[in-house]
A protein has these predicted regions:
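Glycoside hydrolase catalytic-domain context in secreted enzymes
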Residues: 20-325
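Bacterial Sec-dependent N-terminal signal peptides
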Residues: 1-22
Length: 325
């Protein structure tokens, strides 16, 4: 699915050249795997690293030299937010149209109607595509465990089976528009208090029977192209770069081959981000990394710190190529 998402990007940049003149990565007649590998071979080390982290609050850089566009993300699960300024939260004022404020996902789940969920996903996906967004930051399927969670309305209830069966058609509807659905927040993210520091303690039975089924169905039935990690910790390791949940379960047991992105400011360690399954690091200018920097995004864990480790020979490029691929 990571190749599918990248293939959509390649399709958007195909140049009006004859088949003989086209490089393989722009030749729509070639298999997507071949096109991706050709594009990968043309990227410099610096260009590859730039593809793994944010360049603004809601985008990551493309590669203009090869005609590869930026990736633009957008909130949220029940409506396309107005565009905001590059490094401020004020509205940019660059659009004068309106978007639909859809019912929250808790309302959608209450219909028990997968066909309605498909229509919902198709509709919000159309609006995301109209706004030239690559990734919709939703839907959310965290399980209700406390009524004090102020974000419960974003999710699909307390029943893992219902949430999974309702989220899958939503995902398919969004992605029919060529927009990636980003299912969040993986996983065990069930309240907002101390969300960056809470270390969740749960046994495997509860994990697999309550907290993971909706995500598993999102991947295996919905075909999600993207997953967002959660802020909290599990087994003492942040879930945006958690070996057990991302590599062992998501990519290993479930066979997910899409893109794992961090929640905004949810990355905390370069080594873990490299090795533990994270593909793209997102956040804002104010992640505590901006002191003295002309561009705070260069200080992200998967930015210059990652690039320097490669240049110093402390880490190879196998993981980098996988993230970019």
């Amino acid at each position: 699915m990571k190749k599918v998402l990248f293939g959509l990007v390649l399709a958007a940049v195909a140049l009006p050249l004859s088949a003989q003149q086209k490089p393989v990565y722009l030749d729509a007649s070639k298999p997507i795997e071949e096109r991706v590998e050709d594009a990968l071979s043309r990227l410099t080390l610096e260009e590859k690293v730039k593809l793994t982290h944010a360049q603004s609050k809601f985008s990551s850089a493309g590669v203009p030299r090869l005609g590869i566009p930026d990736v633009w993300t957008d909130d949220g699960p029940h409506g396309i937010r107005p565009d905001v300024l590059w490094d401020e939260w004020e509205q940019a004022g660059c659009t004068n149209d309106s978007c639909v404020a859809f019912p929250a996902l808790t309302c959608l789940a209450a219909t028990w109607n997968p066909e309605m969920s498909l229509l919902y996903g198709q509709s919000i996906g159309e609006e995301a595509r109209y706004r030239n967004k690559s990734v919709l930051l939703g839907p959310g399927v965290n399980i209700y465990r406390t009524p004090l969670n102020g974000r419960n309305f974003e999710y699909m209830g307390e029943d893992p089976y219902l949430a999974g069966k309702m989220v899958s058609p939503y995902i398919r509807g969004v992605q029919q528009n060529g927009v990636a659905a980003c299912v969040k927040h993986f996983a065990l993210n069930n309240h907002e208090v101390n969300r960056h520091t809470t270390n969740v303690i749960v046994d495997d039975r509860a994990l697999y029977e309550i907290y993971l089924p909706a995500f598993k169905m999102a991947v295996q039935e919905g075909g999600a192209w993207s997953i967002m990690g959660a802020y909290n910790l599990y087994k003492g390791q942040h879930l945006c770069h958690n070996q057990y949940t991302l590599n062992d379960i998501l990519k290993g047991e479930w066979g997910f081959d899409g893109v794992v992105i961090s929640d905004w400011g949810g990355t905390h360690d370069t080594w873990q981000a490299i090795t533990n399954g994270l593909d793209m690091e997102f956040g804002s200018w104010t992640n505590g990394l901006s002191n003295g920097a002309s561009n705070a995004y260069d200080n992200y864990y998967l930015a210059n710190p990652y690039l320097n480790l490669i240049r110093e020979g402390k880490v190879g490029t196998t993981e980098l190529d996988d993230k970019v691929r």
